[in-house]
């Protein structure tokens, strides 16, 4: 007789194991599974476990050459999603042996690879991952982290302020550097290259780096504060990216920037290693994230991309605002903000956190609030994000009627007023507008900003109901 039974068999016979007790070394995943009509949830969950680990669609004789029990993913728990018809959260455990050490790329290729095109599922979304400490320890993580960044910048007890230079495309390098100088001189801590500023014909990267470095040093000398500009090192090849980072280091600037999703995790991890070795901070922009995370039934939740970034490495990452033009629901946003900053996060389904996660002292990442925010939002932002954050006002600085430097002054005054009020025990949520109005009395720059933006609101239905 043949040594194995050929043919197609149900995934659930091998990969659905409700009695399995998860190991501390397993990578755990929570998938939101929408099976095709007629496909039972156990089969759908088992199919996800199989296709993202050792399985294939039919029995193969080479299965006999290995121990499936040792290497297979297991769907160990399934629960229906309240309020949704035929949708389930399927929990899958993956043995650690399946993954290459220190490679986010390999982890994602397995867990969110082919399985997302699987025909038995209408849709599939990865909601959360539990990264075991044994795997966390194979990554360097953020180049420096929150505490080291504060020590490098000598800035404590308040959020940091940034500004994206606009118009994002079309300025010459010298005019760009001038805008950087004005913002930093006015009182911001950082300015930022837009994510799509790389090295275009109207402004090559080397010219931009030089003029921005000049702006940094001039504003530092005049204000006595340490300043930075996120020089975007993202490039078409990894070699070119590192070349740009090397030039930034030679200029002596404090921070560079990378678009980690369009650039890719392999490139990002290389850059993070370079930044740690050379004392550069690394600002991460999440361009392309909404392609992956915006639909609630398919793709990947941003909290997974945030965890992946903390492993791959970055000191800042954009994380939504809760209040501006880009969406983000408060509790869910705060859930992944805590995942970025804290060393230990408890499971809390109300905040979208499916697993308890320990980071074994991997440095934290500063969340960046950016997108359609202005001075009237300052009390809410200070309250929601706390001190360990970067608040970035692009149009909210450069749109000031008197120019860039007064725009920066307005933001800095508003921030200092909110921090002082909070430290005095006032309630920012209730008294926010009053605090800003009081500060307007002694800051004409802030008063002018408040007048311009008093009516602006970005209020639409939440998008992820599609």
Swiss-Prot record:
GO CC list: chloroplast
The question of whether Oxidoreductase is a record keyword is answered with yes
Identify a single GO molecular function assigned to this protein: monooxygenase activity
Task: Output this protein's name.
Answer: Ribulose bisphosphate carboxylase large chain
What keywords appear on the UniProt entry?
Calvin cycle, Carbon dioxide fixation, Chloroplast, Disulfide bond, Lyase, Magnesium, Metal-binding, Methylation, Monooxygenase, Oxidoreductase, Photorespiration, Photosynthesis, Plastid
What organism does the UniProt record list as the source? Silene gallica (Common catchfly)
Output the Gene3D superfamilies linked to this UniProt entry: Ribulose bisphosphate carboxylase, large subunit, C-terminal domain, RuBisCO large subunit, N-terminal domain
Q: What does this protein do?
A: RuBisCO catalyzes two reactions: the carboxylation of D-ribulose 1,5-bisphosphate, the primary event in carbon dioxide fixation, as well as the oxidative fragmentation of the pentose substrate in the photorespiration process. Both reactions occur simultaneously and in competition at the same active site.
State where the protein is found.
Plastid, Chloroplast
Show the catalytic activity: 2 (2R)-3-phosphoglycerate + 2 H(+) = D-ribulose 1,5-bisphosphate + CO2 + H2O; D-ribulose 1,5-bisphosphate + O2 = 2-phosphoglycolate + (2R)-3-phosphoglycerate + 2 H(+)
Q: What else is known?
A: The basic functional RuBisCO is composed of a large chain homodimer in a 'head-to-tail' conformation. In form I RuBisCO this homodimer is arranged in a barrel-like tetramer with the small subunits forming a tetrameric 'cap' on each end of the 'barrel'.
What does the organism's lineage look like at the top? Eukaryota, Viridiplantae, Streptophyta, Embryophyta, Tracheophyta
* Assembly and oligomerization: Heterohexadecamer of 8 large chains and 8 small chains; disulfide-linked. The disulfide link is formed within the large subunit homodimers.
Q: Which amino acid positions bind substrate, per UniProt?
A: 114, 164, 168, 286, 318, 370
**Any idea of its EC number?**
4.1.1.39
- Entry PTM: The disulfide bond which can form in the large chain dimeric partners within the hexadecamer appears to be associated with oxidative stress and protein turnover.
Cofactors per UniProt? Mg(2+)
Q: Which gene is the coding source of this polypeptide chain?
A: rbcL
């Amino acid at each position: 007789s043949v040594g194995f039974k050929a043919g197609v068999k149900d995934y659930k016979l091998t990969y659905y194991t409700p009695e399995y007790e998860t190991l501390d070394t397993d990578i755990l995943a929570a998938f939101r599974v929408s099976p095709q009509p007629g496909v039972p949830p156990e089969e759908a969950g088992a199919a996800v476990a199989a296709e993202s680990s050792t399985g294939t669609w039919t029995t193969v004789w080479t299965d006999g050459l290995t121990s499936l029990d040792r290497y297979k993913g297991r769907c160990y728990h399934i629960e229906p999603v309240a309020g949704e018809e035929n949708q389930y959260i399927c929990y899958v455990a993956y043995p650690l042996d399946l993954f290459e050490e220190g490679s986010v790329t390999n982890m994602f290729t397995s867990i969110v690879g082919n399985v997302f095109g699987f025909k038995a599922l209408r849709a599939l979304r990865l909601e959360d991952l539990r990264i075991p400490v044994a795997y966390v320890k194979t990554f360097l993580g953020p180049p420096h982290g929150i505490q080291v960044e504060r020590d490098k910048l000598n800035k404590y007890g308040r959020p940091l302020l940034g500004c994206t230079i606009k118009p994002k495309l079309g300025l010459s390098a010298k005019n760009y550097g001038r805008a950087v100088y004005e913002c930093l001189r006015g009182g911001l801590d950082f300015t930022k290259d837009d994510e799509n500023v790389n090295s275009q014909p109207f402004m090559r990267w080397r010219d931009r780096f030089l003029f921005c470095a000049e702006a940094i040093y001039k504003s530092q000398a005049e204000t006595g504060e340490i300043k930075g500009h996120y020089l975007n090192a993202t490039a078409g090849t990894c070699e070119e990216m590192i070349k740009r980072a090397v030039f930034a280091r030679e200029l002596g600037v404090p921070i560079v920037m990378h678009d980690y999703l369009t650039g890719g995790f392999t490139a990002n991890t290389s850059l993070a290693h370079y930044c740690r070795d050379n004392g550069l901070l690394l600002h991460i922009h999440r361009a392309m994230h909404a392609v992956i995370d915006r639909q609630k039934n398919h793709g990947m939740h941003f909290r997974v991309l945030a965890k992946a970034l903390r492993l791959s490495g970055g000191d800042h990452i954009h994380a939504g605002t809760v209040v501006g033009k880009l969406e983000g629901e408060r509790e869910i946003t705060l859930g992944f903000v805590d995942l970025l900053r804290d060393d230990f996060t408890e499971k809390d389904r109300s905040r979208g956190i499916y697993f308890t996660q320990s980071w074994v002292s991997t440095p934290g990442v500063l969340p960046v609030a950016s997108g359609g925010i202005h001075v009237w939002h300052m009390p809410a932002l200070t309250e929601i994000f706390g001190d360990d954050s970067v608040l970035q006002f692009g149009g909210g600085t450069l749109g000031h009627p008197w120019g860039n430097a007064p725009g920066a002054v307005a933001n800095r005054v508003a921030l200092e007023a909110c921090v002082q009020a909070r430290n005095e025990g006032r309630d920012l949520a209730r008294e926010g507008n009053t605090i800003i109005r009081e500060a307007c009395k002694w800051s004409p720059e802030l008063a002018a900003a408040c007048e311009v933006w008093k009516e602006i609101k970005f209020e639409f239905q939440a998008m992820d109901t599609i």
